[in-house]
């Protein structure tokens, strides 16, 4: 560089070819990455070349060795020895087979031929009596020979695993592959059984056993891959076939070899290889779907043997987390993509139940040593696995597992088929003998040889089989059947539990000893015995739980005696009959406190064990309540006396109320569902035929009920999906409205309607008479037809105001203006005409109260179903406007409207004669074939008889003693459901156009009738007077008005009802008093000329009083004497005279 050179500065600016600093740095970075990539690519290419060269060299060497091997065996003339078999036959064979077939995962025809040759030589050597030639001699020879033998045998196990995976129907040379695999399995079975070795002696037997254990431990390890291969092989079997019988039997026999090594009582950390074999078996073999279906009967007997099941049970219990993790990882690795796939842990449950309970006699023969220990482990294993399965499927549902949004209907059908086959494996649990054997083993002390490091809880859980353990098992089964059984749900389990003799009584006795006070639920007990019965902690007292477990044996003695038909002993007899009805009546003391203190924390406040027991009881008893008739429930009082029914109802009422009030987690959902169902069934039975004090249902909410407006708001806001999980008063009023007094619920109903009217008014809808109201013209003689034609199509718009114009019989418009009163008259007239039996839409029940029920002949009338739907809207309009209609519906019909269950005994109010006949059939002691009944019912319409089958082929099915219950429920179902449902659905559609279904469900059937037609109590004259208006010159102080109220008080209750009907067209008072009568009760003055002496004996007014029912107006002349007013009023209200607007 020239230092003397003068530095020049360019003033021309930056050149377009120059780049910025950031761009230069980015360019340099990119070049650096390119160089790094080039280095990595070069290294990768060198590695690939190295691997390829290695592969080519090994393949070439393997081919050369194979050719030499084939030439050697084709012309060998040397004397065969064990060393020659090992070094010249087996060693090169294992090398080239591994290089040419195993690593390629494909078997060539040439290799199959080599395998056949090698295995035949090896089998010949093994069967030889010559120690110099027998391959097994190496196992008991020198240390070097035994190591060689073990190494080569392990490689044959690996080769066997490979061959098993290739035994699928897609293999071209499947028969040849099966043949060589059968040979190899036969060799391995001999090699793992030293007793079958021809060279075995007393001196070398220990060495042979040691060598055998080495191989068996390798088979049970993950390195061998044997259990994975057996799993893949069995899953390829579509069914059991004779051609694969040998290979299937041999493969499973070899897989069971590790179980026949001397086992400790529990899993032993000192024998990890043996433990691994059991883990592999549980996680890979027992998870095979429908395992039992693929195996021959001989193998099933082997798999269900105690020596196989017991170690499996121990491993699952003590290594639960590890086993479940292995199963989960296996599922992920297999990448199951089938829609609705059953989780693998579910198949473990199914396979264990199928193996342990192949038949009643096979469910652990009592002659086996320590059978109670087997039952303990069996129950704990099923519960452990079931809880894991339920945690996977209950949160999202089985249909959402591995969800494929493009799943077709065929995949859906396949998923249902898989679930049905899975449920079929659980069928033994639904048999009474299964429960009987578990109960027989419950409570017995069991001697357990436990590992000294085992946890205390594990030891304790395995010492006895208690009632709670069995309850947990069946509670889990109920939940599994709910999710997995697409057809019947939990019905198979519930049928068995419900009709098991004495089982439900024993469940309740166990619960009662823990949850309820011992001396009843009285106020004294609640105040003075709180220390004794309080439940301030999450779990029940240890003393009660211990007492429950210790007494479980005694409580099950009666159950087992009923199973076996044995007569109970004296003490047992006392316990068995202690729950029979006595002569005492139901205690109706108003001082009873039915709020159970121990359940005020809801499901969260009780232990998991008791919660499980409670869930099982609720589900089972709810199922039983469906079929219990009134004779059994009220007269015979089975399974419980009415006093205990009260305690059950109070317990459920408290549990559900506080569970909804405080909120519950997903883990309590099943308990709450079953408790709610059981509570509703008891409450509905009590509504129909009371057996509980009214205070019982109100008790939980007596101190915590919110204001009416608040309850209404929370009821409306709460989403349906959050009813059970979100703590709120809205949940309480939605699920258990009966804890609120009826009057308060009516207030809530009115609040709902007021809010709806306000929202409609804000939306611009018409809510009062005016120019924009709906206008209709109705002929007096055709009220129903004209109303149907003009109003049927407007749907929910019927909430708006209706302007009615009547046309008289002469065809002329009637005088007067409609300011709302004519709408009431229209509703009254249309219901009077449509509900008349002569019209044909409704008929009256044959009972004394003459309740309305849809007539079966209505379906044959023109527009019959549409007319009933229209009448639903008319009734909804009356409820919406607060107009009382003097009609009441059958409870069966209302139950359908409210979406509630109808008991078979409700048939007595619908068709008493049919009910008596069905009860006669139910309790008939002779042969029912003598009655010549079949599954049909005969209906008559217009003189024509038609026969309807109660089930397919019913006319050819005779009623017998075996199917009489099916016949009774089929007949009841026809009368209570099939015959009524089309009409109730139509009426419901119309009714809910105006009244929300949620509003209706605040009431029971009896209360619905009261809401529609008013209370059935006597009229409160003072309340009516306070809410009466006077027009035309009358006032409350007028002489005639004072006389009227004196006469009104002097009437009989029936006469007061007639007067009310004369004025309002309804004989009953509004539910919450005359304040809510619409329109308001009015007395209008009708001036009449009378003598001044009329008040003391002269001529009084002769004119009769009249009324305008459309305005609830009584037109009362100015009578001077009480006797005259009484006479004229009675004549008017009993004459049934017609009238027009005046």
Swiss-Prot record:
UniProt biased composition (Polar residues): 577-589
Sorted alphabetically, which keywords does the UniProt record give? Transferase, Ubl conjugation pathway
Q: Which residues form the HECT domain?
A: 794-1142
In this protein, the active site sits at 1110 (glycyl thioester intermediate)
Kindly list the GO molecular function terms attached to this UniProt entry.
Answer: ubiquitin protein ligase activity
Lineage top rank: taxon: Eukaryota
Q: Does the keyword Thylakoid apply?
A: no
Report the pathway entry: Protein modification; protein ubiquitination
Q: Which reaction does it catalyse?
A: S-ubiquitinyl-[E2 ubiquitin-conjugating enzyme]-L-cysteine + [acceptor protein]-L-lysine = [E2 ubiquitin-conjugating enzyme]-L-cysteine + N(6)-ubiquitinyl-[acceptor protein]-L-lysine
User: Which GO biological process categories is it annotated with?
Assistant: protein polyubiquitination
Q: Which Pfam families match?
A: HECT (PF00632)
Q: Which residues form the IQ domain?
A: 41-70
The EC number(s) attached to this protein equal 2.3.2.26
Quick one: where's region Disordered? 567-589
Has the keyword Transferase been applied to this entry? yes
The first-level EC class reads transferase
**SUPFAM superfamilies in the record:** Hect, E3 ligase catalytic domain (SSF56204)
- Hey, which family's this protein in? Belongs to the UPL family.
Its function, per the record, reads: Probable E3 ubiquitin-protein ligase which mediates ubiquitination and subsequent proteasomal degradation of target proteins.
The protein in question is named: E3 ubiquitin-protein ligase UPL7
Q: Which organism is it from?
A: Arabidopsis thaliana
Starting at the broadest rank, the lineage of the source organism is: Eukaryota, Viridiplantae, Streptophyta, Embryophyta, Tracheophyta
Primary gene name: UPL7
